[in-house]
Amino acid sequence: MASFPHPGSVTVCEINRDLITAQNLSDERAQETYGKVLGMVFSPVSFDSTPSSLQENEGQENGDKASGESKGLVATLQMKVADSLKQILQPTDVTLLSEIDLQGVSWHQGKHIIAFISGANQVTIRDYEDKDEKEPCILTSDSQRNVKALEWRPNGGKSLSIACRGGICIWAASYPGNMALVRSGGSALRGSLSRGSGTRWILVDFLRCQNDEQISALSWSPCGRYLASASYDSSSFTIWDVSQGAGTPIRRGLGGISMLKWSPTGDYFFAARFDGTFCLWETNTWTSEPWSLSSGSGSVTGAIWDPEGRFILISFSKSSTLGSVHFSSKPPSLDAHLLPVELPEIASLTGCEGIEKIAWDASGERLAVSYKGGDENYKGLIAIYDTRRTPIVSASLVGFIRGPGENPKALSFSFHDKFKQGPLLSVCWSTGFCCTYPLIFRSHVLP
Protein backbone atom coordinates (compact mmCIF):
# COMPACT_ATOMS: atom_id res chain seq x y z
CA MET A 1 0.00 0.00 0.00
CA ALA A 2 1.31 3.46 -0.91
CA SER A 3 2.58 5.68 1.91
CA PHE A 4 0.37 8.72 2.53
CA PRO A 5 1.57 11.69 4.65
CA HIS A 6 -1.33 13.02 6.70
CA PRO A 7 -2.08 16.77 6.68
CA GLY A 8 0.08 18.55 9.24
CA SER A 9 2.99 16.12 8.87
CA VAL A 10 6.19 16.55 6.84
CA THR A 11 8.12 13.87 4.96
CA VAL A 12 11.66 13.03 6.11
CA CYS A 13 12.90 10.20 3.84
CA GLU A 14 12.13 6.80 2.36
CA ILE A 15 13.19 3.56 4.03
CA ASN A 16 12.41 0.47 1.93
CA ARG A 17 9.25 1.82 0.22
CA ASP A 18 8.03 3.44 3.45
CA LEU A 19 8.03 7.25 3.39
CA ILE A 20 8.81 8.35 6.94
CA THR A 21 7.10 11.47 8.32
CA ALA A 22 7.50 13.79 11.31
CA GLN A 23 5.45 16.55 12.93
CA ASN A 24 7.88 19.26 11.85
CA LEU A 25 11.25 19.86 10.17
CA SER A 26 13.98 18.63 12.48
CA ASP A 27 17.64 17.67 12.06
CA GLU A 28 17.22 15.40 15.08
CA ARG A 29 14.49 13.41 13.37
CA ALA A 30 16.57 13.22 10.19
CA GLN A 31 19.54 11.94 12.19
CA GLU A 32 17.37 9.23 13.77
CA THR A 33 15.93 8.00 10.48
CA TYR A 34 18.72 8.25 7.90
CA GLY A 35 21.63 10.21 9.38
CA LYS A 36 23.21 7.18 11.03
CA VAL A 37 23.03 5.24 7.75
CA LEU A 38 24.37 7.96 5.43
CA GLY A 39 26.74 9.61 7.88
CA MET A 40 25.27 13.05 7.22
CA VAL A 41 22.07 15.08 7.46
CA PHE A 42 20.74 17.36 4.73
CA SER A 43 19.35 20.31 6.66
CA PRO A 44 16.60 22.28 4.89
CA VAL A 45 17.58 25.68 3.47
CA SER A 46 15.11 28.52 3.96
CA PHE A 47 14.53 31.30 1.44
CA ASP A 48 12.10 34.16 0.85
CA SER A 49 9.25 32.68 -1.19
CA THR A 50 7.23 35.91 -1.36
CA PRO A 51 6.09 36.41 -4.97
CA SER A 52 8.30 39.04 -6.61
CA SER A 53 7.58 38.40 -10.28
CA LEU A 54 5.13 41.32 -10.44
CA GLN A 55 7.78 43.78 -9.30
CA GLU A 56 10.22 42.33 -11.82
CA ASN A 57 7.72 42.65 -14.68
CA GLU A 58 6.76 46.17 -13.69
CA GLY A 59 10.38 47.18 -13.63
CA GLN A 60 10.92 45.67 -17.05
CA GLU A 61 7.89 47.44 -18.51
CA ASN A 62 8.99 50.78 -17.09
CA GLY A 63 12.45 50.20 -18.48
CA ASP A 64 11.01 49.42 -21.90
CA LYS A 65 8.92 52.59 -21.82
CA ALA A 66 11.85 54.78 -20.88
CA SER A 67 13.99 53.07 -23.48
CA GLY A 68 11.37 53.70 -26.16
CA GLU A 69 11.11 57.39 -25.26
CA SER A 70 14.86 57.85 -25.44
CA LYS A 71 15.21 56.12 -28.81
CA GLY A 72 12.73 58.38 -30.61
CA LEU A 73 9.65 57.85 -32.73
CA VAL A 74 11.12 55.57 -35.42
CA ALA A 75 12.74 53.20 -32.95
CA THR A 76 9.56 53.11 -30.87
CA LEU A 77 7.45 52.21 -33.91
CA GLN A 78 9.91 49.47 -34.88
CA MET A 79 9.72 48.05 -31.38
CA LYS A 80 5.89 48.08 -31.44
CA VAL A 81 5.81 46.30 -34.82
CA ALA A 82 8.22 43.65 -33.54
CA ASP A 83 6.10 43.19 -30.40
CA SER A 84 2.95 42.83 -32.53
CA LEU A 85 4.56 40.14 -34.68
CA LYS A 86 5.70 38.34 -31.54
CA GLN A 87 2.12 38.41 -30.21
CA ILE A 88 0.87 36.85 -33.46
CA LEU A 89 3.52 34.12 -33.64
CA GLN A 90 3.71 33.36 -29.93
CA PRO A 91 0.42 34.52 -28.38
CA THR A 92 0.38 32.28 -25.30
CA ASP A 93 4.02 31.50 -24.58
CA VAL A 94 4.40 33.66 -21.48
CA THR A 95 1.12 32.50 -19.96
CA LEU A 96 2.11 28.86 -20.54
CA LEU A 97 5.53 29.38 -18.94
CA SER A 98 4.10 28.65 -15.49
CA GLU A 99 3.14 25.15 -16.70
CA ILE A 100 6.66 24.25 -17.84
CA ASP A 101 9.17 22.47 -15.61
CA LEU A 102 11.86 25.17 -15.55
CA GLN A 103 14.99 23.88 -13.85
CA GLY A 104 14.94 25.83 -10.60
CA VAL A 105 17.15 23.48 -8.55
CA SER A 106 20.32 21.60 -9.55
CA TRP A 107 22.80 19.30 -7.80
CA HIS A 108 26.49 19.38 -8.70
CA GLN A 109 27.35 16.14 -10.53
CA GLY A 110 30.32 15.20 -8.36
CA LYS A 111 29.84 17.14 -5.11
CA HIS A 112 27.21 17.47 -2.40
CA ILE A 113 26.49 21.05 -3.50
CA ILE A 114 23.02 22.26 -4.38
CA ALA A 115 21.97 25.46 -6.14
CA PHE A 116 18.42 26.78 -6.41
CA ILE A 117 16.54 29.91 -7.46
CA SER A 118 15.71 31.81 -4.27
CA GLY A 119 14.42 35.11 -5.67
CA ALA A 120 13.68 37.00 -8.86
CA ASN A 121 17.34 37.94 -9.28
CA GLN A 122 19.25 35.62 -6.97
CA VAL A 123 20.46 32.05 -6.54
CA THR A 124 21.35 30.24 -3.31
CA ILE A 125 24.16 27.67 -3.05
CA ARG A 126 24.48 25.22 -0.14
CA ASP A 127 27.65 23.14 0.13
CA TYR A 128 26.96 20.16 2.42
CA GLU A 129 30.62 19.10 2.22
CA ASP A 130 31.89 22.38 3.72
CA LYS A 131 31.72 21.86 7.48
CA ASP A 132 32.80 25.47 8.07
CA GLU A 133 29.95 26.95 6.03
CA LYS A 134 27.60 28.46 8.59
CA GLU A 135 25.10 29.84 6.09
CA PRO A 136 24.33 29.35 2.39
CA CYS A 137 25.92 31.54 -0.26
CA ILE A 138 23.76 34.02 -2.20
CA LEU A 139 24.69 34.93 -5.80
CA THR A 140 23.58 38.33 -7.11
CA SER A 141 24.74 40.57 -9.94
CA ASP A 142 23.57 43.57 -11.96
CA SER A 143 23.74 41.22 -14.97
CA GLN A 144 21.59 38.60 -13.25
CA ARG A 145 18.01 39.78 -13.86
CA ASN A 146 14.88 37.64 -13.74
CA VAL A 147 16.43 34.22 -13.15
CA LYS A 148 14.49 31.36 -14.79
CA ALA A 149 16.75 28.27 -14.80
CA LEU A 150 20.16 27.00 -13.70
CA GLU A 151 22.46 24.02 -14.26
CA TRP A 152 25.93 22.96 -13.10
CA ARG A 153 28.56 22.53 -15.80
CA PRO A 154 29.68 18.90 -16.26
CA ASN A 155 33.43 18.33 -15.92
CA GLY A 156 33.84 22.02 -15.15
CA GLY A 157 34.85 22.06 -11.50
CA LYS A 158 32.49 24.22 -9.49
CA SER A 159 30.90 26.17 -12.35
CA LEU A 160 27.23 27.15 -12.49
CA SER A 161 25.20 28.57 -15.40
CA ILE A 162 22.15 30.75 -14.72
CA ALA A 163 19.51 31.75 -17.29
CA CYS A 164 18.58 35.43 -17.02
CA ARG A 165 17.11 38.26 -19.03
CA GLY A 166 19.60 39.24 -21.70
CA GLY A 167 21.90 36.24 -21.39
CA ILE A 168 23.53 33.59 -19.20
CA CYS A 169 25.61 34.19 -16.08
CA ILE A 170 28.53 31.79 -15.55
CA TRP A 171 29.74 31.63 -11.93
CA ALA A 172 32.77 29.73 -10.63
CA ALA A 173 34.13 28.97 -7.17
CA SER A 174 37.33 30.75 -6.20
CA TYR A 175 39.57 29.66 -3.34
CA PRO A 176 43.31 29.40 -2.59
CA GLY A 177 44.94 27.12 -5.14
CA ASN A 178 41.99 27.39 -7.53
CA MET A 179 41.38 31.00 -8.51
CA ALA A 180 38.42 31.52 -10.86
CA LEU A 181 39.44 33.23 -14.11
CA VAL A 182 37.27 35.69 -16.02
CA ARG A 183 37.15 34.87 -19.75
CA SER A 184 39.31 37.19 -21.82
CA GLY A 185 37.13 39.40 -24.00
CA GLY A 186 34.02 38.65 -21.97
CA SER A 187 31.28 41.16 -21.25
CA ALA A 188 31.76 43.70 -18.49
CA LEU A 189 30.61 42.12 -15.23
CA ARG A 190 29.18 44.73 -12.90
CA GLY A 191 27.94 44.50 -9.35
CA SER A 192 28.71 40.80 -8.95
CA LEU A 193 28.49 39.55 -5.40
CA SER A 194 28.45 36.31 -3.46
CA ARG A 195 27.35 36.59 0.17
CA GLY A 196 28.01 33.82 2.65
CA SER A 197 30.53 32.36 5.06
CA GLY A 198 31.91 29.64 2.79
CA THR A 199 33.47 29.52 -0.68
CA ARG A 200 33.75 32.75 -2.63
CA TRP A 201 31.97 32.72 -6.01
CA ILE A 202 33.03 34.86 -8.99
CA LEU A 203 30.94 35.83 -12.02
CA VAL A 204 33.45 34.82 -14.69
CA ASP A 205 31.37 35.36 -17.83
CA PHE A 206 28.10 36.66 -19.20
CA LEU A 207 26.98 35.11 -22.49
CA ARG A 208 24.93 37.90 -23.99
CA CYS A 209 21.99 37.13 -26.30
CA GLN A 210 20.36 39.42 -28.84
CA ASN A 211 17.55 41.88 -28.13
CA ASP A 212 17.70 41.43 -24.36
CA GLU A 213 15.75 38.16 -24.64
CA GLN A 214 14.64 36.29 -21.55
CA ILE A 215 16.62 33.03 -21.44
CA SER A 216 14.28 30.41 -19.99
CA ALA A 217 15.91 27.04 -20.83
CA LEU A 218 19.44 25.64 -20.43
CA SER A 219 21.12 22.30 -21.09
CA TRP A 220 24.82 21.35 -20.99
CA SER A 221 26.40 18.80 -23.30
CA PRO A 222 27.74 15.85 -21.25
CA CYS A 223 31.36 16.84 -21.97
CA GLY A 224 30.78 20.34 -20.59
CA ARG A 225 32.08 22.18 -23.66
CA TYR A 226 28.76 23.26 -25.14
CA LEU A 227 25.77 24.95 -23.51
CA ALA A 228 22.36 25.10 -25.20
CA SER A 229 20.02 27.96 -24.38
CA ALA A 230 16.58 29.08 -25.53
CA SER A 231 13.97 31.74 -24.91
CA TYR A 232 10.20 31.77 -25.06
CA ASP A 233 10.75 35.00 -27.03
CA SER A 234 12.44 33.15 -29.90
CA SER A 235 11.83 30.22 -32.25
CA SER A 236 15.54 29.30 -32.32
CA PHE A 237 17.91 27.89 -29.72
CA THR A 238 21.61 28.65 -29.39
CA ILE A 239 24.58 26.31 -28.95
CA TRP A 240 27.37 28.11 -27.08
CA ASP A 241 31.05 27.19 -27.20
CA VAL A 242 31.48 28.53 -23.69
CA SER A 243 35.28 28.80 -23.63
CA GLN A 244 35.09 31.02 -26.72
CA GLY A 245 31.94 32.88 -25.71
CA ALA A 246 30.52 32.19 -29.18
CA GLY A 247 26.93 31.13 -29.88
CA THR A 248 25.43 29.47 -32.97
CA PRO A 249 21.64 29.81 -33.43
CA ILE A 250 19.68 26.80 -34.71
CA ARG A 251 16.11 27.16 -35.92
CA ARG A 252 13.32 24.83 -36.98
CA GLY A 253 9.67 25.90 -37.05
CA LEU A 254 7.85 28.77 -35.37
CA GLY A 255 6.84 29.43 -31.80
CA GLY A 256 8.81 29.85 -28.60
CA ILE A 257 10.92 27.03 -27.18
CA SER A 258 9.98 25.80 -23.72
CA MET A 259 12.54 23.12 -22.91
CA LEU A 260 15.95 21.73 -23.94
CA LYS A 261 17.48 18.40 -22.87
CA TRP A 262 20.83 16.98 -24.03
CA SER A 263 21.04 13.18 -23.83
CA PRO A 264 23.55 11.62 -21.36
CA THR A 265 25.68 10.30 -24.24
CA GLY A 266 25.56 13.57 -26.17
CA ASP A 267 24.26 11.85 -29.33
CA TYR A 268 20.75 13.28 -29.15
CA PHE A 269 19.09 16.56 -28.23
CA PHE A 270 15.46 17.26 -27.28
CA ALA A 271 13.68 20.59 -27.85
CA ALA A 272 10.02 21.22 -26.95
CA ARG A 273 7.79 24.12 -27.95
CA PHE A 274 4.82 25.75 -26.27
CA ASP A 275 2.48 24.61 -29.05
CA GLY A 276 2.75 20.98 -27.92
CA THR A 277 5.26 19.88 -30.58
CA PHE A 278 8.84 18.77 -30.01
CA CYS A 279 11.91 17.87 -32.05
CA LEU A 280 14.51 15.15 -31.60
CA TRP A 281 17.92 16.11 -33.00
CA GLU A 282 20.98 14.00 -33.66
CA THR A 283 24.06 16.06 -32.84
CA ASN A 284 26.44 14.66 -35.47
CA THR A 285 24.98 16.70 -38.35
CA TRP A 286 22.23 18.48 -36.35
CA THR A 287 19.42 16.85 -38.29
CA SER A 288 16.02 16.74 -36.60
CA GLU A 289 12.73 14.88 -36.65
CA PRO A 290 9.58 16.80 -35.58
CA TRP A 291 6.91 15.18 -33.41
CA SER A 292 3.31 16.28 -32.94
CA LEU A 293 0.89 14.58 -30.55
CA SER A 294 -2.88 14.82 -30.26
CA SER A 295 -4.20 18.09 -28.87
CA GLY A 296 -5.80 16.13 -26.04
CA SER A 297 -2.38 15.59 -24.46
CA GLY A 298 -1.68 19.31 -24.09
CA SER A 299 1.80 20.83 -24.07
CA VAL A 300 5.06 19.20 -22.93
CA THR A 301 5.66 20.03 -19.25
CA GLY A 302 8.69 17.85 -18.51
CA ALA A 303 11.24 15.56 -20.16
CA ILE A 304 14.01 13.30 -18.83
CA TRP A 305 16.45 10.97 -20.58
CA ASP A 306 17.08 7.49 -19.26
CA PRO A 307 20.63 7.01 -17.89
CA GLU A 308 21.90 5.38 -21.12
CA GLY A 309 20.22 7.87 -23.46
CA ARG A 310 18.20 5.13 -25.20
CA PHE A 311 14.85 6.85 -24.70
CA ILE A 312 13.27 9.95 -23.17
CA LEU A 313 10.29 10.20 -20.80
CA ILE A 314 7.89 13.07 -21.50
CA SER A 315 5.01 14.50 -19.42
CA PHE A 316 2.02 16.48 -20.70
CA SER A 317 -0.19 19.20 -19.27
CA LYS A 318 -3.51 17.45 -19.96
CA SER A 319 -2.64 13.81 -19.33
CA SER A 320 -1.69 11.66 -16.34
CA THR A 321 0.05 9.20 -18.70
CA LEU A 322 3.69 9.76 -19.67
CA GLY A 323 5.15 9.16 -23.11
CA SER A 324 8.37 7.25 -23.75
CA VAL A 325 10.16 7.84 -27.06
CA HIS A 326 12.43 4.86 -27.80
CA PHE A 327 15.09 4.89 -30.50
CA SER A 328 14.93 1.88 -32.82
CA SER A 329 18.55 2.07 -34.01
CA LYS A 330 21.92 3.33 -32.84
CA PRO A 331 22.97 6.99 -33.25
CA PRO A 332 22.73 8.98 -35.42
CA SER A 333 19.48 7.29 -36.49
CA LEU A 334 16.31 9.22 -35.61
CA ASP A 335 14.01 6.23 -36.09
CA ALA A 336 11.93 6.07 -32.92
CA HIS A 337 8.52 5.07 -31.59
CA LEU A 338 6.33 6.41 -28.79
CA LEU A 339 5.01 4.18 -26.00
CA PRO A 340 2.63 5.15 -23.18
CA VAL A 341 3.85 4.87 -19.58
CA GLU A 342 1.00 4.53 -17.12
CA LEU A 343 1.34 5.98 -13.63
CA PRO A 344 -0.77 3.61 -11.53
CA GLU A 345 -3.20 5.15 -9.05
CA ILE A 346 -2.23 8.79 -9.59
CA ALA A 347 -5.46 9.71 -11.35
CA SER A 348 -7.75 7.56 -9.18
CA LEU A 349 -6.19 8.65 -5.88
CA THR A 350 -5.52 12.32 -6.52
CA GLY A 351 -7.99 13.25 -9.24
CA CYS A 352 -5.13 15.03 -11.00
CA GLU A 353 -5.72 16.96 -14.23
CA GLY A 354 -2.27 16.53 -15.75
CA ILE A 355 1.42 16.30 -14.89
CA GLU A 356 3.33 19.44 -13.84
CA LYS A 357 6.90 18.26 -13.23
CA ILE A 358 8.90 15.05 -13.37
CA ALA A 359 12.38 14.01 -12.21
CA TRP A 360 14.12 10.63 -12.59
CA ASP A 361 17.15 9.54 -10.61
CA ALA A 362 20.30 8.46 -12.46
CA SER A 363 19.84 4.79 -11.57
CA GLY A 364 16.39 4.79 -13.17
CA GLU A 365 14.80 3.38 -10.00
CA ARG A 366 12.87 6.35 -8.59
CA LEU A 367 10.59 8.77 -10.43
CA ALA A 368 9.18 11.92 -8.80
CA VAL A 369 5.97 13.44 -10.18
CA SER A 370 3.98 16.55 -9.31
CA TYR A 371 0.54 17.05 -10.74
CA LYS A 372 -2.23 19.58 -11.31
CA GLY A 373 -5.26 19.66 -9.10
CA GLY A 374 -6.00 17.02 -6.50
CA ASP A 375 -8.46 16.99 -3.62
CA GLU A 376 -7.84 18.50 -0.20
CA ASN A 377 -5.75 15.54 0.98
CA TYR A 378 -3.57 15.10 -2.12
CA LYS A 379 -3.16 18.65 -3.41
CA GLY A 380 0.47 19.83 -3.51
CA LEU A 381 2.04 16.41 -2.86
CA ILE A 382 4.81 14.75 -4.90
CA ALA A 383 4.23 11.16 -5.99
CA ILE A 384 7.22 8.78 -5.79
CA TYR A 385 7.33 5.77 -8.12
CA ASP A 386 9.52 2.68 -8.17
CA THR A 387 10.49 2.27 -11.84
CA ARG A 388 11.86 -0.51 -14.02
CA ARG A 389 13.33 0.04 -17.50
CA THR A 390 13.38 -3.46 -19.00
CA PRO A 391 11.94 -4.58 -21.26
CA ILE A 392 9.88 -1.37 -21.24
CA VAL A 393 9.37 1.35 -18.64
CA SER A 394 6.97 0.42 -15.84
CA ALA A 395 6.14 2.18 -12.58
CA SER A 396 4.62 1.25 -9.22
CA LEU A 397 3.55 3.83 -6.65
CA VAL A 398 5.67 4.01 -3.47
CA GLY A 399 3.86 6.92 -1.85
CA PHE A 400 3.70 10.69 -1.54
CA ILE A 401 5.95 13.43 -0.17
CA ARG A 402 4.45 16.35 1.75
CA GLY A 403 6.38 19.58 2.18
CA PRO A 404 6.59 21.89 5.22
CA GLY A 405 4.25 24.74 6.08
CA GLU A 406 0.68 25.51 5.13
CA ASN A 407 -0.51 24.35 1.69
CA PRO A 408 2.99 23.59 0.33
CA LYS A 409 3.44 23.26 -3.42
CA ALA A 410 6.56 22.12 -5.27
CA LEU A 411 8.14 24.98 -7.23
CA SER A 412 10.90 22.76 -8.62
CA PHE A 413 12.73 19.53 -7.78
CA SER A 414 15.70 17.49 -8.94
CA PHE A 415 17.71 14.36 -8.09
CA HIS A 416 21.40 14.22 -7.17
CA ASP A 417 22.81 12.11 -10.02
CA LYS A 418 25.93 10.82 -8.28
CA PHE A 419 24.90 10.16 -4.67
CA LYS A 420 26.30 6.67 -4.04
CA GLN A 421 23.91 5.62 -1.27
CA GLY A 422 20.80 5.94 -3.45
CA PRO A 423 18.45 8.54 -4.92
CA LEU A 424 18.54 11.96 -3.28
CA LEU A 425 15.60 14.24 -4.15
CA SER A 426 15.62 17.98 -3.41
CA VAL A 427 12.45 20.07 -3.58
CA CYS A 428 11.96 23.84 -3.44
CA TRP A 429 8.61 24.42 -1.75
CA SER A 430 6.32 27.44 -2.09
CA THR A 431 6.48 27.81 1.69
CA GLY A 432 10.12 28.93 1.52
CA PHE A 433 12.16 25.78 2.14
CA CYS A 434 14.47 23.71 -0.04
CA CYS A 435 14.28 20.21 1.47
CA THR A 436 16.30 17.12 0.59
CA TYR A 437 14.87 13.59 0.86
CA PRO A 438 17.12 10.48 0.81
CA LEU A 439 15.26 7.56 -0.77
CA ILE A 440 16.94 4.53 0.81
CA PHE A 441 15.95 1.05 -0.32
CA ARG A 442 19.10 -0.88 -1.25
CA SER A 443 20.07 -3.72 1.09
CA HIS A 444 23.78 -2.85 1.00
CA VAL A 445 23.01 0.62 2.38
CA LEU A 446 20.72 -0.38 5.22
CA PRO A 447 22.22 -2.08 8.28
UniProtKB/Swiss-Prot annotation:
Can you tell which superkingdom this protein's organism belongs to? Answer: Eukaryota
Transmembrane found in the keyword field: no
Query: In which broad location class does this protein mainly occur, judging by the first location in its UniProt entry?
Result: nucleus
Assigned keywords, A-Z: mRNA transport, Nuclear pore complex, Nucleus, Protein transport, Repeat, Translocation, Transport, WD repeat
Gene3D superfamilies listed in its UniProt record = YVTN repeat-like/Quinoprotein amine dehydrogenase (2.130.10.10)
Residue spans of the WD repeats: 97-138, 142-181, 210-250, 252-291
| Localization annotation | Nucleus envelope; Nucleus, Nuclear pore complex
* GO CC terms in record: endoplasmic reticulum; nuclear envelope; nuclear pore
* Annotated spans, Disordered: 49-69
Q: Name one GO biological process term.
A: mRNA transport
User: Is Amino-acid biosynthesis tagged as a keyword?
Assistant: no
Name one matching Pfam family: Beta-prop_Aladin
Q: How does it assemble?
A: Part of the nuclear pore complex (NPC). The NPC has an eight-fold symmetrical structure comprising a central transport channel and two rings, the cytoplasmic and nuclear rings, to which eight filaments are attached. The cytoplasmic filaments have loose ends, while the nuclear filaments are joined in a distal ring, forming a nuclear basket. NPCs are highly dynamic in configuration and composition, and can be devided in 3 subcomplexes, the NUP62 subcomplex, the NUP107-160 subcomplex and the NUP93 subcomplex, containing approximately 30 different nucleoporin proteins.
- Name of protein: Aladin
Q: Which organism is it from?
A: Arabidopsis thaliana (Mouse-ear cress)
Q: What phylogenetic lineage does the species belong to?
A: Eukaryota, Viridiplantae, Streptophyta, Embryophyta, Tracheophyta
